[in-house]
Structure formats: structure tokens, C-alpha cells
Amino acid sequence: MKFTGSMLLIVLTQVCSAQYYYKDLVTTRQNERRWSLYKENRVKSVKLSSFERDGKPAEGFTGDQEVSGESLTTHTKASGNAESWIVATYTPQGLTQKITDTSDTYRSASDYQYDADGRLQSILNTSIETDNHLRDVEQHIWTYDAAGKPSSMLKIKNGNDTTFVRFVLDEKGNVAEERAMRNKTDLPVIYYYYDTDSRLTDIVRYSLKAKRLLPDNIFEYGDDGRTSSMLVVPDGSNDYLKWLYDYNEKGLKSRESCISRQKELLGKIEYQYTYK
């Protein structure tokens, strides 16, 4: 099995379906913290190198990131996958402003809007499959309670398909449950679990097939507070992949290693930084 291909896409996305709280709020904050680290350490560019389980470079893979002004461009190309350019633009305050994802046959643009307190208010995504001219528009509209915690979200697709999402908080104010309804039908509940420091540890949903709660993701943290590993269960799979993270002295990610359920190394991605 080659490391590039579907597994490479998982390391770039790492988000299962639904998980609106994780995808819209948590992941966005993580990307903004990475951007802040890039700016703080005056990162100019990053080279991504992919290696197979035997340590040999992954054939046909190239990857790099370029920092220019208030934007970060990530370019990747892998055997069997379309060449991709992801451009993330940030406000002077470090908030995500726009993300575009472009390949030979696909283009997606997400515009972010915030309220006066800097809380995410709306994400408007427009995606186009250029080869067959299909166009989708999806908007996520967020609302918050008096304490500034997420209370609900509307997902509106193509102006006429609405999913209502509400959030249940735990005693510490963390989002504990994500309950969605579409066409008057309840969708599977997403559960979020945390450690004593309110760090996200598990994202779980009920499996109709297994008739029990099963994880989508499991997170672990090092003594420095950084994420040390993330377990990913691909949609519709009984298997999982686990990503192990290493960081350099500046707190920047230096390596991502992928291991299988059988604890076999499948491959790794290394990051080399150039500074201004």
C-alpha cells in the first residue's frame, strides 16, 4: 500500500462528515494559531516531504507552503490525485478571512464573517466542478448564547436545503453534544469529550451497524500542551489511522507519522522551514 493518495488526503483534511463544531470553530482556531506561529517566527516557506513505510521518498509527491503578506498558499501534488492549491487569507487580527481550494477540475471558495466580538458568524462556501459545471453554495450561520458559547447553527445548501444544528454544553461550558435535524428528521448525534483542562479528547457518534458509540477521532496531548497524536476513523470504515506529531524548538510541526491499527508505520510527512 502506498502512503500517498487517500491517506495523504486524510492528513490534509482530517475531518469526518458533520462535526460542524469541530470543523468550523475548532479547526479554524487551530489554523489561526498555526498562522500566528508562522508570523511570530517569520516563516517564509515550508517544504513538505512525504516518505513511504520503508523510508524512501513517496514517488510523485511534491508539497510546499508560501507565506506572502496576509496569505498562506499550500501546494500539493501526489500520484493518483489532482494537483491542488489552497490559499488561506487572514485579517490583520489573524482571523481567517477566505480560503480557496483549486485543482484542475474543482474550485472552492469559503468566505468568513465575524461579529463585533470576533466570533465566527458565517461561512459562505461556493464550490464548482469545472469539468461538468456543477455549482453548490453552502452557508453556515452561527449564533451564540449570552456567555459567548455556541448555541446553534444553520446549514443552508443552495438556498433551499436547511439543516438545523443545536449545541448542548457541559458544566464547564464546553460543547458536549451536536444535535442536528434535516427535513424534520433527527440526524446522528455527535458527542465531544474533554480532559480536565477542557482539551478535546474524543469525538464520538452512535453506530447503527455496531449498535454502540464509536469514535471518529481521539486526541492526545504532550506535556507541552501540544497535540501529540490524533486517531482518525475514515467514514464507513472499521479500521483507523493514527497520526503522531513532532515539533521543533519553535513549536512548529516538524513531522507527521502515520501508523495503522496494527501499529505498523505507513509513512510520514516532514516539514522543513525557511525563515525571513
Where are the regions that the model predicts?
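Bacterial Sec-dependent N-terminal signal peptides
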Residues: 1-23
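Buried hydrophobic residues that stabilize the cores of well-folded domains
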Residues: 19-276
